[in-house]
UniProtKB/Swiss-Prot annotation:
Entry protein name: Chaperone protein DnaJ
Residues that bind Zn(2+) 1: 147, 150, 200, 203
Organism: Alcanivorax borkumensis (strain ATCC 700651 / DSM 11573 / NCIMB 13689 / SK2)
Cofactor: record remark: Binds 2 Zn(2+) ions per monomer.
PROSITE patterns according to UniProt: DNAJ_1 (PS00636), DNAJ_2 (PS50076), ZF_CR (PS51188)
Highest rank taxon of the organism: Bacteria
Residues engaged in binding Zn(2+) 2: 164, 167, 186, 189
Length: 376
C-alpha cells in the first residue's frame, strides 16, 4: 500500500512552521500513544505513521528533499514503519516532544540542558545574472552572539553555575496524575539543571548579547527564487553556552528587463520589422553571455518561437544548460511620412490584386466568421 502524504498524516499545511508541525505531531501522539491504547494495533500503526512523518518534516534537509521529490527523496533516511518499531524505538524524537509529559516512556527522561539557539532566516535579493553565474554576497544579520566576557556561561568571572537544588541537577521534576507519571521541566532552573547565582554583568546571565554580524555567503551558480542556503552554526547563539542555531538564506531573484526564467530555460521577446519577417534575415539576440545571431526565415509570423539550445541556465546541481526561447513580435511602424504611407497603400493594393494567396490566415479567419454567422 502506498504511503500517505506526510503533511496529510499530520493534518498540517505544506507551509506549516516547525512549531505548527510539532503541535500537530504532539496532538496525534497523545491520541494514539500505546500507553493510552493498550493492545490496539490500529492506534499503534497510526502512532508510528505520525512519528515517521514528523521525523522527516522536523528535519530541514529531509523536509526540503521531501517537498521536492516526495517519498522518493527521503527513502533510506530513517523514519520507515519498521525503523524503531519496538518499545524502545521511539527514541530521541519522542523524548523531544513528550519529555515533559510522559516520564521516561519515550526514552527522553534525561536532563534537557541549555536551549539551542534559534534558527534565523534571511531573504537575499539577487539579479538574474548573479543567480545564473553565482556570486559572493555580504549580508548583515541582527542576532544574538556569545558573550565575550563570560564566554557563553552566563556566570560572573571567577564564579561557576551551581547545581539546582529543586531537581538535583536533573532539570526535570515528576508528578503523578492518575495512571500517568507527568514529567516537566524544573520551574527553578528551566530544565537546565544549573542555576547562576552570580550572573555576568555584560550579558545579565544569559551568556549571549545582541549584535549585528556581517557574513559572506557563497551563492552557487544556477540558484532560483525559493532556493535556500544553510549556514550551519550562524544562527542565534544558545543560552548559557548551548550550540548556536543555523542561518537559512532564502534566494529571491529580481525581475529582469529582458528575460523571464522558467526552471533552466530563459524566455524573451524579440521585436522585428514586418520587412524582416516577410523577407527573412539575421538578428542579434541577447543572451546572458553576449549576443548571438538568430536566422529568421522568410514569411515568419508574429508569435513564432525560436529555440536556442544551451543558451539558458545551467542547473545548480550540474548538468546541461537549458535553452533560450525567443518569441518573434512583429512591430508595426509608427510616425510614417506621407510618402511612406502612400507606398504602403500601393503595396496593400498589390497584395489584394493577388487574391487570397498572400494572406491565407486572414482569409481563413474571415471564412470561419462567415460560416459562424451563417449557422445562426
Amino acid at each position: 500500500m502506498s504511503k500517505r502524504d506526510y503533511y496529510e498524516v499530520l493534518g498540517a499545511a505544506k507551509d506549516a512552521s516547525a512549531q505548527d508541525l510539532k503541535k500537530a505531531y504532539r496532538r496525534l501522539a497523545m491520541k494514539y500513544h500505546p500507553d493510552r491504547n493498550p493492545d490496539d494495533k490500529e492506534a499503534l500503526a497510526k502512532f508510528k505513521e505520525a512519528k515517521e512523518a514528523y521525523e522527516v518534516l522536523a528535519d530541514e534537509q529531509k523536509r526540503a528533499a521531501y517537498d521536492q521529490f516526495g517519498h522518493a527523496g527521503v527513502n533510506g533516511q530513517g523514519g520507515g514503519p519498521g525503523a524503531g518499531a519496538g518499545a524502545g524505538g521511539f527514541g530521541d524524537i519522542f523524548g523531544d516532544i513528550f519529555g515533559d509529559i510522559f516520564g521516561g516512556a519515550g526514552g527522553g527522561g534525561g536532563r534537557r540542558g541549555p536551549s539551542r539557539g534559534a534558527d534565523l532566516r534571511y531573504t537575499l535579493e539577487l539579479s538574474l545574472e548573479q543567480a545564473v553565474r553565482g556570486c559572493d554576497e555580504k549580508i548583515r544579520i541582527p542576532t544574538w552572539d556569545s558573550c565575550d566576557v563570560c564566554h557563553g556561561s552566563g556566570a560572573k568571572e571567577g564564579s561557576q553555575p551551581v547545581t539546582c537544588t529543586t531537581c538535583g541537577g536533573v532539570g526535570q521534576v515528576r508528578m503523578q496524575q492518575g495512571f500517568f507519571t507527568v514529567q516537566q521541566a524544573c520551574p527553578t532552573c528551566k530544565g537546565e539543571g544549573k542555576i547562576i547565582k552570580d550572573p555576568c554583568g555584560n550579558c545579565g546571565g544569559q551568556g549571549r548579547v545582541q549584535n549585528t554580524k556581517t557574513l559572506s555567503v557563497k551563492i552557487p551558480a544556477g540558484v532560483d527564487t525559493g532556493d535556500r542556503i544553510r549556514l550551519a552554526g550562524e544562527g542565534e547563539a544558545g543560552v548559557h553556552g548551548a550550540p548556536s542555531g543555523d542561518l537559512y538564506v532564502q534566494v529571491a531573484v529580481r525581475e529582469h528587463d529582458i528575460f523571464q526564467r522558467d526552471g533552466d530555460n530563459l524566455y524573451c521577446e524579440v521585436p522585428i520589422s514586418f520587412v524582416d519577417a516577410t523577407l527573412g534575415g539575421e538578428l542579434d539576440v541577447p543572451t546572458l553571455n553576449g549576443k548571438v545571431k538568430l536566422k529568421v526565415p522568410a514569411e515568419t509570423q508574429s508569435g513564432k518561437l525560436f529555440r536556442l539550445r544551451g543558451k539558458g541556465v545551467a542547473p545548480v546541481r550540474g548538468g546541461a544548460p537549458g535553452d533560450l526561447l525567443c518569441k518573434v513580435v512583429i512591430e508595426t511602424p509608427v510616425k510614417l511620412s506621407s510618402e511612406q504611407k502612400e507606398l504602403l497603400r500601393k503595396f496593400q493594393e498589390s497584395l489584394e490584386s493577388g487574391g487570397n494567396r498572400h494572406n491565407p490566415r486572414k482569409n481563413n479567419w474571415f471564412e470561419g466568421v462567415k460560416r459562424f454567422f451563417d449557422t445562426k
